[in-house]
């Protein structure tokens, strides 16, 4: 039997054990994982450096290298994320609704695990731990398929977590890493309906499209982040500049960073905003008017409006009003995160009602589209689809429901 099927069978068996565990048992296991990662951080960092060295030699972009890299600070954040998930309320077993029928049947809708989740993701090794902590907390087993560029890091993390589980109620076979990162094995994984209950892809547009187009297993689709900020005519100067700088520059390589700023043509501080971005090393690609007015602005192409740069590059366009901004977002947005900066409440209502995206912001950075920032703990991904879950996906998003019907001998006669 090949690696994929062996691990899938182990996961399916482990998921049956997981579904029966108490919240206390799951939390205790997460604490052991947190302690083990802390204890073995030197090993993890050494393995990550192997991936980083290979990535540099292969010419990976700065954005991908940033996603790949682990540091002591990032490991601290990973450990904190595991403990935060442990501290969150366990949704499994929650009674969502309950009612009694005229014939005396008492019906409950309760929250239960999905079963076995397949995670398909790219260079970010922190996703390995985020996915495991969320899945175990909700009683799900997880098959991890990371990228070849992060294989050393992922193997180290999974080995540490499996070892930690040996002293807990959770079987170590509840976590499996698919070490064969070939395209052929991935395609087989996408069709493993007898073992996997859902696939969750996290990564670039190509990865997500490959999973969506080739999977027969249901997919919880996470989306590309071509995110926009609209700076309205009434936007307060310092607030607008601060938000745009944060949304672009705090971490340009992530999906909730902005890629386009739409500016009302009568906003008085266009030049100050562009100068602030330019001074911080942002490459600006603007419409014809902006390119003609500012020597450091390159004229944008049609492709620029579509592009998720994941880098310190920003497309900028002047618009006549909120409706033109909305139409631009309709055409080029990816339904991830969109923001409006304005003091006009009517424009806020119009923007919120008209724009189709998982998360909309008024006078705040798009960088808050994040499970931890939403209070969910580490996130499993950010969904841009509309079925089952949308936006940052925390614990509830990776559960489903079942109906429990309590009777006293009722039979159906009609």
UniProtKB/Swiss-Prot annotation:
Enzyme class: oxidoreductase
Superkingdom in the source lineage: Bacteria
Gene Ontology MF terms: glutamate-5-semialdehyde dehydrogenase activity; NADP binding
Pathway: Amino-acid biosynthesis; L-proline biosynthesis; L-glutamate 5-semialdehyde from L-glutamate: step 2/2
Major localization listed first in the record, in broad terms: cytoplasm
Reactions performed catalytically: L-glutamate 5-semialdehyde + phosphate + NADP(+) = L-glutamyl 5-phosphate + NADPH + H(+)
Entry keywords, A to Z: Amino-acid biosynthesis, Cytoplasm, NADP, Oxidoreductase, Proline biosynthesis
Single GO BP term: L-proline biosynthetic process
Gene Ontology cellular-component terms listed: cytoplasm
EC number: 1.2.1.41
HAMAP family reported for this sequence: ProA
Transmembrane segments: none
Functional summary from the UniProt entry: Catalyzes the NADPH-dependent reduction of L-glutamate 5-phosphate into L-glutamate 5-semialdehyde and phosphate. The product spontaneously undergoes cyclization to form 1-pyrroline-5-carboxylate.
Record-stated family: Belongs to the gamma-glutamyl phosphate reductase family.
Name of the featured protein: Gamma-glutamyl phosphate reductase
Naturally occurring in which organism (per UniProt): Geobacillus thermodenitrificans (strain NG80-2)
InterPro entries: Ald_DH/histidinol_DH, Ald_DH_C, Ald_DH_N, Aldehyde_DH_dom, G-glutamylP_reductase_CS, Glu-5-SA_DH, GPR_dom
Paired cysteines (S-S): none
Gene name, Swiss-Prot/TrEMBL: proA
Compartments where found: Cytoplasm
One matching Pfam family: Aldedh
